[in-house]
């Protein structure tokens, strides 16, 4: 399918994504997004303003349409041109442009389970609980104990008797049942 398939179709009824697919199919090679947009604009005879308004949707359609594949750096191709396994190899990864040899030399494997403690690379799994850390220095602990009157922090409530008598609490509103009341209920049944 190419642009020749659209010769009998009204160009106003064609979508930009259909025309882009036909253009890439006719060309048979990768194209920059800007070039695709220019070709679509020429074929559909659309004004710059119309293209500018439809451009975000067109770009979204190219990303979501399974027939297109981004090759990186805003270059597009048709997915059918590549074997399934080769798609990832063909895509340009700009973040991978660095020298692979130099990155491999910098990475050093570390075994965290070594029995020796020669280097700083060994992880101490016995000292990994933040709750075990002592937040105060031992030298200040003696001074703090002398100044600390932990008994002063708590009241010795000598008037505990006042707690038993709640004024108009819910306890006053509830009726209390005695064993005699339970026996009376059983007799009535």
Swiss-Prot record:
GO cellular component: DNA-directed RNA polymerase complex
Annotated keywords: DNA-directed RNA polymerase, Nucleotidyltransferase, Transcription, Transferase
Gene Ontology BP annotations: DNA-templated transcription; regulation of DNA-templated transcription
Biased composition (Acidic residues): 90-100, 118-189
Alphabetical list of PROSITE patterns matching this protein: HTH_HARE
Keyword Nuclease tagged: no
Domain HTH HARE-type: 14-81
Pfam family, one: HARE-HTH
InterPro entries per record: Asxl_HARE-HTH, RNAP_delta_N_dom_sf, RpoE
Region spans: Disordered: 90-189
One Gene Ontology term of the molecular function aspect: DNA-directed RNA polymerase activity
Taxonomy, superkingdom: Bacteria
Entry keyword Cell cycle: no
Stated family: Belongs to the RpoE family.
Function recorded in the entry: Participates in both the initiation and recycling phases of transcription. In the presence of the delta subunit, RNAP displays an increased specificity of transcription, a decreased affinity for nucleic acids, and an increased efficiency of RNA synthesis because of enhanced recycling.
Assembly and interaction partners: RNAP is composed of a core of 2 alpha, a beta and a beta' subunits. The core is associated with a delta subunit and one of several sigma factors.
Annotated protein name in UniProt: Probable DNA-directed RNA polymerase subunit delta
Gene that encodes the chain: rpoE
